[in-house]
Amino acid sequence: MSLAPSDVIFAPASGVGGAISLLRLSGAGVARVIGALAGSLPAPRRASLRSFRDGRRGIIDRGLLLWFPGPASVTGEDYAEFHLHGGRAVRAAITAALLDLGARPAEPGEFSRRAFLNSRLDLLEAEGIADLIDAETEAQRQLALDLAGGAMSRAVAAWREALIGLMAQLAALIDFADEDLPAEVEAAMLASMARLRDEIVAAIGAGLAAERLREGVEIVVLGAPNAGKSTLVNALAGEEVAIVSDIPGTTRDAIGVRLDLGGVPVRLVDTAGLRRSDDAIEAEGVRRAEAHARRADLLILCGAAPDFVVPDAPADVPALRIATKADLGGAVPAAMLAVSARTGAGLADLLAALRARVEALVERGAGPALPRPRQIACLRDVAAALDRALAIDVPELRAEEMQAAAVALARLTGTIGVEDVLDQVFSSFCIGK
């Protein structure tokens, strides 16, 4: 995005056709636009009832005007809101008038981008806003709200302050290398550095769990043909998302459905029955099922009555073993959960077991976390630099590694070196954000 920051931009922040239409404006010429459309500037931060008019159309509408002079505004520049009636004709007329006055429609995320460029929010807060817009479940909302509200930004600021203090101590040790300083001084500095490194490592672990929460936990259902996988998926989803048939090999491709398990987003994936097949399409379905199993966060291994044999699964992926079609009889092994998707028996117990497993997968401890791969990568860079600094005995080289850690922290909040990230972050926003 390469746009002039001085342009007056505008965008609707509400849908068309409602009772009220909210229009946002930002830029150095907002006061001029207000003067042309609504007369004199109102008192800042107070709602004022005005008639909005232009020379060609006369009165366009009557509504509320709010004026926020920069830099004390949401974007850091002059900003206004028009609260008008929500009809399409009103929206079209006010848009035409704004275009006549030289304003232009905002690009996706441009309001938030200007707020970032004017230091009204940092990159972590901007990413939190994007995640809040996309949040589907309560747990995702809480995670995104912590990020958007600056909780992680404050944690990063504390890490930065601690790192700067350590760098100052190291600089003093280098400057006074000829002095007979007590060995305890350097030992205390290294102990503090190790504690900071441990905090960063803990944050990486929390971030990996939070990433799973942000992206959604993938649960893959595996079993032989006719093991009741599709019927089970339909029962858990509460709708018919997969075709059910007594004919083996009916499911030939992975079919996913989104679920909300206790506030955690889940993608439940039905797969082709695992067996050798001369049918090229079915064989490809089996290959894809095995690939999904290797990438899964959790497996449901289905074994149907009467023998309840479950398939082999990747050893590094946790699994629940389910005895499907339990209503048909047979001795269910003690390690398996008996379920009948046809009668509903055992489904509540299965959902409870899934919820417990899913909550354990996204457990990140108390406090906020960094859920995006970019953020976790920055933390890993910080931890790696601190590890190298702790392992080096040469003070000048140790200082270089600590500087590398500081640079990685700065990239985390967008202070430096993130131009390639900005377009990706803000382009995911809606127009009015």
Curated annotation (Swiss-Prot):
<keyword id="KW-0479">Metal-binding</keyword>
<dbReference type="InterPro" id="IPR005225">
    <property type="entry name" value="Small_GTP-bd"/>
</dbReference>
<comment type="function">
    <text>Exhibits a very high intrinsic GTPase hydrolysis rate. Involved in the addition of a carboxymethylaminomethyl (cmnm) group at the wobble position (U34) of certain tRNAs, forming tRNA-cmnm(5)s(2)U34.</text>
</comment>
<keyword id="KW-0547">Nucleotide-binding</keyword>
<feature type="binding site">
    <location>
        <position position="433"/>
    </location>
    <ligand>
        <name>(6S)-5-formyl-5,6,7,8-tetrahydrofolate</name>
    </ligand>
</feature>
<feature type="binding site">
    <location>
        <begin position="245"/>
        <end position="251"/>
    </location>
    <ligand>
        <name>GTP</name>
    </ligand>
</feature>
<dbReference type="InterPro" id="IPR006073">
    <property type="entry name" value="GTP-bd"/>
</dbReference>
<comment type="subunit">
    <text>Homodimer. Heterotetramer of two MnmE and two MnmG subunits.</text>
</comment>
<dbReference type="Pfam" id="PF01926">
    <property type="entry name" value="MMR_HSR1"/>
</dbReference>
<keyword id="KW-0819">tRNA processing</keyword>
<keyword id="KW-0630">Potassium</keyword>
<feature type="binding site">
    <location>
        <begin position="340"/>
        <end position="342"/>
    </location>
    <ligand>
        <name>GTP</name>
    </ligand>
</feature>
<feature type="binding site">
    <location>
        <position position="230"/>
    </location>
    <ligand>
        <name>Mg(2+)</name>
    </ligand>
</feature>
<dbReference type="Pfam" id="PF10396">
    <property type="entry name" value="TrmE_N"/>
</dbReference>
<feature type="binding site">
    <location>
        <begin position="226"/>
        <end position="231"/>
    </location>
    <ligand>
        <name>GTP</name>
    </ligand>
</feature>
<keyword id="KW-0378">Hydrolase</keyword>
<dbReference type="GO" id="GO:0003924">
    <property type="term" value="F:GTPase activity"/>
</dbReference>
<feature type="binding site">
    <location>
        <position position="81"/>
    </location>
    <ligand>
        <name>(6S)-5-formyl-5,6,7,8-tetrahydrofolate</name>
    </ligand>
</feature>
<dbReference type="InterPro" id="IPR027266">
    <property type="entry name" value="TrmE/GcvT_dom1"/>
</dbReference>
<keyword id="KW-0460">Magnesium</keyword>
<feature type="binding site">
    <location>
        <position position="24"/>
    </location>
    <ligand>
        <name>(6S)-5-formyl-5,6,7,8-tetrahydrofolate</name>
    </ligand>
</feature>
<feature type="binding site">
    <location>
        <position position="245"/>
    </location>
    <ligand>
        <name>K(+)</name>
    </ligand>
</feature>
<dbReference type="InterPro" id="IPR027368">
    <property type="entry name" value="MnmE_dom2"/>
</dbReference>
<dbReference type="GO" id="GO:0046872">
    <property type="term" value="F:metal ion binding"/>
</dbReference>
<protein>
    <recommendedName>
        <fullName>tRNA modification GTPase MnmE</fullName>
        <ecNumber>3.6.-.-</ecNumber>
    </recommendedName>
</protein>
<dbReference type="GO" id="GO:0030488">
    <property type="term" value="P:tRNA methylation"/>
</dbReference>
<dbReference type="Pfam" id="PF12631">
    <property type="entry name" value="MnmE_helical"/>
</dbReference>
<keyword id="KW-0342">GTP-binding</keyword>
<dbReference type="GO" id="GO:0002098">
    <property type="term" value="P:tRNA wobble uridine modification"/>
</dbReference>
<feature type="binding site">
    <location>
        <position position="251"/>
    </location>
    <ligand>
        <name>Mg(2+)</name>
    </ligand>
</feature>
<feature type="binding site">
    <location>
        <position position="120"/>
    </location>
    <ligand>
        <name>(6S)-5-formyl-5,6,7,8-tetrahydrofolate</name>
    </ligand>
</feature>
<keyword id="KW-0963">Cytoplasm</keyword>
<feature type="domain" description="TrmE-type G">
    <location>
        <begin position="216"/>
        <end position="359"/>
    </location>
</feature>
<feature type="binding site">
    <location>
        <position position="247"/>
    </location>
    <ligand>
        <name>K(+)</name>
    </ligand>
</feature>
<feature type="binding site">
    <location>
        <begin position="270"/>
        <end position="273"/>
    </location>
    <ligand>
        <name>GTP</name>
    </ligand>
</feature>
<dbReference type="InterPro" id="IPR027417">
    <property type="entry name" value="P-loop_NTPase"/>
</dbReference>
<feature type="binding site">
    <location>
        <position position="226"/>
    </location>
    <ligand>
        <name>K(+)</name>
    </ligand>
</feature>
<comment type="similarity">
    <text>Belongs to the TRAFAC class TrmE-Era-EngA-EngB-Septin-like GTPase superfamily. TrmE GTPase family.</text>
</comment>
<dbReference type="InterPro" id="IPR031168">
    <property type="entry name" value="G_TrmE"/>
</dbReference>
<dbReference type="GO" id="GO:0005737">
    <property type="term" value="C:cytoplasm"/>
</dbReference>
<dbReference type="InterPro" id="IPR018948">
    <property type="entry name" value="GTP-bd_TrmE_N"/>
</dbReference>
<dbReference type="InterPro" id="IPR025867">
    <property type="entry name" value="MnmE_helical"/>
</dbReference>
